[in-house]
């Protein structure tokens, strides 16, 4: 069976008009024509490092003086378990439910957490791989390829070398395992798991300056990471290991996550949105609901709710 000849420009244009309509086609053409200009302007904006949030920036985000930042951070810590359905008082009941309804699952969860404490990960078909004492968040540990951690996220390449999978560092940096560590810390009472969760969050923030490196190249993963961090913080909120200094650092990074997402939403030139855009919105919704004290939060929440309602009409066809 012979391959079909590629469509010429006129045929492609006609096909596009038939599929999305004349007005949408015109809008897409304008967006494509303006793309180089928009890209240059966005790059210039990004290089001014607008997303990084230092302590003074965090105080401004909370609308408090630097002297009052400690109290603002403490208010967030106390509020998180109420904003997400986490109740330390129900631990005994949860353990009983595990034993009755899912025998062996709690033990398996602890075993998984122990492997994570040993920096052993099994991602995307890799099989168990020990990553060593210090986790390299920028490396595809399946192929050994490492992305430049200082590179602007706009310049991060993928699909450029055979056998290299950018999704490996992305999957690791989503932080799903941090929630498991926090969960295990809560259910067992053992400080080992909370300590490891806190150490990995610290290491990630230090190794991944906002907007630099492979782990900022996909906004969807930024959003997923923010959600997982918020859950981990809510579960660990009662831990004495969660110090004000540490929580301040994490909250500053979460504010940076929110600002990054608002500035890098995943919408195609033709206006088509996908699961990536939905993930961006859910990340903003979580940040808006969980960090209500932050001045940006109401805008994040309002935008996310409005767009999620619109996307349900666009993306859910059943």
Residue ranges of model-derived segments:
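Generic detection of long, well-ordered alpha-helical segments
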Residues: 7, 16-19, 23, 59, ...
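Exposed alpha-helical structural elements
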Residues: 9-12, 25, 57, 68, ...
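Residue-level signal for secondary-structure boundary elements
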Residues: 25, 37-45, 106, 262, ...
């Amino acid at each position: 069976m012979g391959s079909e000849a590629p469509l010429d420009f006129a045929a492609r244009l006609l096909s596009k008009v038939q599929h999305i309509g004349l007005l949408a086609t015109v809008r897409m053409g304008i967006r494509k024509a303006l793309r180089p200009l928009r890209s240059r302007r966005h790059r210039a904006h990004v290089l001014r490092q607008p997303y990084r949030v230092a302590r003074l920036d965090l105080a401004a985000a909370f609308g408090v003086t630097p002297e009052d930042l400690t109290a603002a951070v403490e208010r967030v810590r106390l509020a998180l378990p109420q904003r997400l359905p986490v109740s330390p008082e129900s631990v005994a009941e949860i353990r009983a439910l595990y034993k009755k309804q899912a025998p062996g699952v709690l033990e398996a969860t602890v075993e998984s957490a122990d492997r994570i404490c040993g920096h052993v990960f099994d991602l995307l078909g890799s099989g168990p791989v020990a990553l060593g004492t210090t986790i390299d968040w920028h490396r595809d540990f399946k192929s050994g390829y490492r992305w430049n951690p200082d590179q602007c996220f706009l310049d991060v390449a993928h699909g450029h070398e055979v056998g290299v999978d950018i999704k490996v560092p992305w999957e690791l940096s989503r932080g799903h395992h941090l929630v498991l560590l926090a969960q295990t810390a809560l259910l067992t009472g053992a400080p080992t798991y909370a300590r490891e969760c806190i150490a990995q969050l610290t290491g990630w923030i230090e190794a991944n300056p906002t907007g630099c490196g492979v782990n900022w190249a996909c906004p969807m993963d930024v959003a997923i990471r923010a959600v997982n961090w918020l859950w981990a913080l809510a579960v660990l909120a009662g831990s004495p290991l969660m110090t004000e200094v540490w929580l301040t650092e994490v909250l500053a990074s979460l504010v940076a996550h929110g600002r990054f997402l608002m500035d890098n939403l995943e919408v195609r030139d033709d206006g088509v949105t996908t699961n990536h855009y939905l993930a961006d919105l859910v990340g903003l919704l979580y940040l808006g609901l969980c960090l209500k004290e932050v001045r940006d939060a109401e805008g994040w929440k309002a935008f996310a709710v409005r767009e999620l309602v619109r996307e349900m009409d666009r993306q859910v066809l059943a």
